[in-house]
């Protein structure tokens, strides 16, 4: 027999999932927009000094956080032989698990000194819902929530690939 309360629970779940997915997409878009702005600024600076531009690209990607699979995208920026990688995503299916620390999504930054080497993870972020219901990325330091991620903070990671 069909219980009317089951329909209410399903409707509430679907509404919450839709609201969270919208926040996740907004958070991911903020991250990609910030990286695009930073890369444009850096390329203008490099061009003014007659240096080659950053090589950038983005692709669909999956990565593991603890026992969960985050499904999303990976952004890469390369200058000469050094590479900076930014991964962002969240579980899409029940078998993917959940976002640790009650976050909406996770992101990681990796750095490689050589194009032949896998990027080593140097930073992790979690996307959280704010009191005003806007999403914001926060750094995770020693498995604890740290400072909010800003464009200037993201820009600092690019110094790793721009330095000698």
Model-derived segments and their meaning:
Residues 65-164:
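Intrinsic disorder/low-complexity polar-acidic segments
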Residues 2-60:
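Contiguous, amphipathic alpha-helical segments that mediate oligomerization or scaffolding
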């Amino acid at each position: 027999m069909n219980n009317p309360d089951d329909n209410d629970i399903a409707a509430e779940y679907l509404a919450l999932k839709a609201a969270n997915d919208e926040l996740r997409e907004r958070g991911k878009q903020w991250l990609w927009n910030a990286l695009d702005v930073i890369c444009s600024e850096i390329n203008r600076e490099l061009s003014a000094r007659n240096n080659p531009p950053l090589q950038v690209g983005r692709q669909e990607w999956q990565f593991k956080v603890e026992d969960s699979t985050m499904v999303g995208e990976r952004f890469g920026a390369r200058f000469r032989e050094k590479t900076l990688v930014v991964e962002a995503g969240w579980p899409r299916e029940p078998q993917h698990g959940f976002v640790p620390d009650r976050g909406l999504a996770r992101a990681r930054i990796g750095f490689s000194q050589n194009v032949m080497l896998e990027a080593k993870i140097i930073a992790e972020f979690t996307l959280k819902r704010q009191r005003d219901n806007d999403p914001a990325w926060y750094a995770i330091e020693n498995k604890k929530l740290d400072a909010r991620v800003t464009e200037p903070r993201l820009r600092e990671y690019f110094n790793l690939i721009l330095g000698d």
